[in-house]
């Protein structure tokens, strides 16, 4: 599932559509179960056509087109969605096409193999109600160590599970939670209330470092190949994963531990028992 680095890469890749007008909205006939559109296509087409895209933003794991009407088009890739400028790998999984001003071939595409993505057109009031601060936590790249500590220090939940709670902080999913905790030297089962004050600083530094490095590498394209950037190119951060999907392999941090896999909240977690001891006594992993 695309997480913050992948969605931020998508956002940057399509940033050039700012200033374009939406001249047409199409949902290709594929014979597949359609993705969730809100409102329904006829209303969506009417409300979008003629709108100018003022900016391209990101909200957690969502791409946001800011329109001159004040409305926001929210594109949520979910498991396998891609936001593309170029032709997709195939047209059988092409779910939405926005025809743009600036040339007959200019378009913005949403392509999704599994069809779990969601596209919503929201007013400012609807955005605040559905994705405002009460529903979505601060962005993972912007939250401070003190704010993260305030939100989690009394929680009994394991830190790995808490990091993936989008109401606590937005953008981190299963992959980057494992990588961040390895960087910070924190065991994924460590209860939030047992994390020391100085360790919150280490954790927030690790969050920023891992996410920014992943963005610089244009995200992670895993073995299933589902994520690619707006030009349909693979990301490169998967080559730098220290723990994710490396069960049984030597730790790339300490060189002595063997990466273990456990299940938390029905998701796989990967960690090094040496770099991330259950009772933490040392600093961040190098």
PLM region descriptions:
Residues 1-286:
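Structured catalytic/nucleic-acid-binding cores of DNA maintenance enzymes
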């Amino acid at each position: 599932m695309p997480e913050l680095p992948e969605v931020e890469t998508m956002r940057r890749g399509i940033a050039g559509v700012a200033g374009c007008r939406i001249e047409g909205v199409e949902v290709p006939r594929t014979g597949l179960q359609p993705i969730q559109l809100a409102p329904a296509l006829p209303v969506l087409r009417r409300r979008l056509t003629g709108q100018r895209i003022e900016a391209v933003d990101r909200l957690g794991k969502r791409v946001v087109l800011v329109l001159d009407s004040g409305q926001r088009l929210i594109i949520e890739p979910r498991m396998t969605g891609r936001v593309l400028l170029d032709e997709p790998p195939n047209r059988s999984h092409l779910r939405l096409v926005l025809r743009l001003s600036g040339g007959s071939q200019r378009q913005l595409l949403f392509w999704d193999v599994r069809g779990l993505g969601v596209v919503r057109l929201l007013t400012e009031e609807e955005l605040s109600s559905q994705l405002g601060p009460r529903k979505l936590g601060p962005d993972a790249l912007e939250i401070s160590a003190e704010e993260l500590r305030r939100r989690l220090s009394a929680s009994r939940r394991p830190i790995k599970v808490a990091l993936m709670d989008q109401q606590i902080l937005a953008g981190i999913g299963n992959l980057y939670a494992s990588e961040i905790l390895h960087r910070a030297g924190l065991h994924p089962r460590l209860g939030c209330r047992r994390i020391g004050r100085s360790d919150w600083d280490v954790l927030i530094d690790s969050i920023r470092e891992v996410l920014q490095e992943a963005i610089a590498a244009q995200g992670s394209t895993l073995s299933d190949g589902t994520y690619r950037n707006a030009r349909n190119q693979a990301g490169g951060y998967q080559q730098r994963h220290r723990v994710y999907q490396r069960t049984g392999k030597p730790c790339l941090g300490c060189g002595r531990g063997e990466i273990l896999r456990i299940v938390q909240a029905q998701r796989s977690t990967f960690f090094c028992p040496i770099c991330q001891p259950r009772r933490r006594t040392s600093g961040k992993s190098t």
